[in-house]
Amino acid sequence: MATLFIADLHLCAEEPAITAGFLRFLAGEARKADALYILGDLFEAWIGDDDPNPLHRQMAAAIKAVSDSGVPCYFIHGNRDFLLGKRFARESGMTLLPEEKVLELYGRRVLIMHGDTLCTDDAGYQAFRAKVHKPWLQTLFLALPLFVRKRIAARMRANSKEANSSKSLAIMDVNQNAVVSAMEKHQVQWLIHGHTHRPAVHELIANQQTAFRVVLGAWHTEGSMVKVTADDVELIHFPF
C-alpha cells in the first residue's frame, strides 16, 4: 500500500482537462491508497464555502466518494484556497490539517506543508500573507456579498500576477535556511511540499544527517504526485 500526496491543481472552469484528469485520479489511483493528502491550491481561487460554483460541488462529491471508499483524505490550505472551510471539508469528507503537520509513515518521520511559508526571501508576499491570514479580516471578507468577494479576488489575482512578473525566480523559491529550520524544529528527515511548481527531490543536511525535500509539481499538462511506501518515496508524473 501507499500514501499519496498532491498539490497545486489550481482547479477552475477554464481548465477542464485538469479537472477531468483529477477525476480520473480520484476514481483510480487514489482508491488504492492508504491515505490521500492534498497540500494546498486544490482550487485556483476560493472566496467562501457558500460559493455555489458547480465545480466545487462536483469536486466535493468526487473526493467524498474516495473518503467513503475507505481512503482518508486530508487537506492543508494553500495560498489560493486558504479560505476553504469546515463546510466544504465536511461535504468532501476531508480532514483539515494545520499548515505544518508531521506524519509517521512506514518508519519515516515526514513533515508536510503547502510550502509558501518557506519562501521567506519574498518579503512582499510574506507581508501580504500575514495580513490576509488575520482571522478578523477573513471574517469581514466572508461577510461581504458574493459578487463583491468575486471582484476583490479578481483584483487580488491580477495584482499578484503583476507583482510576480517583476520578481526573480530565486526570490519566489524556498529559502534554504527556512527549510532546514522547519525540518530541525520538527526533527524530521523528510519534507514534502508544493507551492513553487518546481518538482524535484533535493538532498540536504538537517538534524546533522542527510535529509530530503520533495517538491510536488503543479498540474498543468500532466499530473504530479508523491507516492510513499515502506520501500520508497517517489515523485511521479503521469498523463491526465
Curated annotation (Swiss-Prot):
UniProt keyword annotation of Lipid metabolism present: yes
GO biological process: lipid A biosynthetic process
Statement: the UniProt record of this protein carries the keyword Transferase: no
Locations listed in the record: Cell inner membrane
Major location category of this protein: membrane
Cofactor: Mn(2+)
Cofactor stoichiometry and binding remark: Binds 2 Mn(2+) ions per subunit in a binuclear metal center.
Protein name: UDP-2,3-diacylglucosamine hydrolase
Biological source species: Escherichia coli O81 (strain ED1a)
Lineage: Bacteria, Pseudomonadati, Pseudomonadota, Gammaproteobacteria, Enterobacterales
Gene of this entry: lpxH
